[in-house]
Amino acid sequence: MVRTINETFLKACRGERTEYVPAWYMRQAGRSQPEYRKIKEKYSLFEITHNPELCAYVTKLPVDQYNVDAAILYKDIMSPLPAIGVDVEIKSGIGPVIDSPIRSLQDVEKLGEINPEDDVPYILDTIRLLTTEMLDVPLIGFSGAPFTLASYMIEGGPSRNYHNTKAFMYAEPKAWFALMDKLADMVITYLKAQINAGVKAVQIFDSWVGAVNVADYRIFIKPAMERIFAEVRPMGVPMIMHGVGAAHLVNEWHDLPLDVVGLDWRLPIEEARARGVHRAVQGNMDPSFLLAPWPVIEEHVKGILDQGMKQPGYIFNLGHGVFPEVNPDTLKRLTTFIHEYSKEQLAK
């Protein structure tokens, strides 16, 4: 069955004019929602993501509760790694932990390839369920970027400084580029499978890429990113690039064949455009503001919207994920305000 969906988000991704500014929030599904916390009392993250009905329910919750203009598939960026031979455990209070970190070219050469229909069928089944039976807004698929995935694989878990990752990059360039190629292949195959299953846009999260300088990005990371965007682009869905702490890298994305640049709060939208970002923009509220009193939030959001709305092709989002402490009512009120204020301003 083909469902009719609200395409405001997709129009903004394509740089088209919209009646109002579309909004969705990174980590909109999950830890800040009481309904989700009740589910987590009974099921682990692994169990939720491996159960299409349960995962689809969690994915759809913020659409129903907050009236956001897009859903993003509820899963972890580490989800595809076991398929290529990486033993990952999500530990409460820590995050992803890998007991056997990458240390050599031999370790890289042991990595396999992903076959999504065989290795992650539950993800594809969740997408099909959502897009054929449940959603009236676009579903966003996603993947971690090679650098961020590699950082977990080399560090063995979250890191504050990525010393091991960068040391490996500098000291073992042959192994590094082999790892980038392996991960790029995985990301390409994984995103294509999500698109074939029904997602209407894809976002690549490079959560830790802000740790590298421009010259190193250009040499050690950008070639893999160029290949990912070039090979996924013919699939015909909007592609979003989001890096955290990556204001210094925005100019490196100008020649990547992507559709939307995701910004965090460190770079104002006006400044990004002044620096040559002439495609759609997504962002860029500091999620910390969501813990402030409503008048403070409203004034701050007005400022972001006033910058974003100066050109067609703007999507409101956070610069990083929703905190567990955020009141769901705040997100509902925020979406309503974004829609109403932007509609009023754009009608002038």
Curated annotation (Swiss-Prot):
What are the EC numbers? 4.1.1.37
Provide this UniProt record's keywords sorted from A to Z.
Answer: Cytoplasm, Decarboxylase, Lyase, Porphyrin biosynthesis
Under Gene Ontology molecular function, one entry of this record is: uroporphyrinogen decarboxylase activity
Q: Name one GO cellular component term.
A: cytosol
Give the metabolic or biological pathway.
Porphyrin-containing compound metabolism; protoporphyrin-IX biosynthesis; coproporphyrinogen-III from 5-aminolevulinate: step 4/4
SUPFAM superfamilies (UniProt xref): UROD/MetE-like (SSF51726)
Where found, per UniProt?
A: Cytoplasm
Q: Would you say which domain of life the source belongs to?
A: Bacteria
User: What name does the UniProt record give this protein?
Assistant: Uroporphyrinogen decarboxylase
Supply the source organism for this entry.
Bacillus mycoides (strain KBAB4) (Bacillus weihenstephanensis)
| Gene name for this UniProt entry | hemE
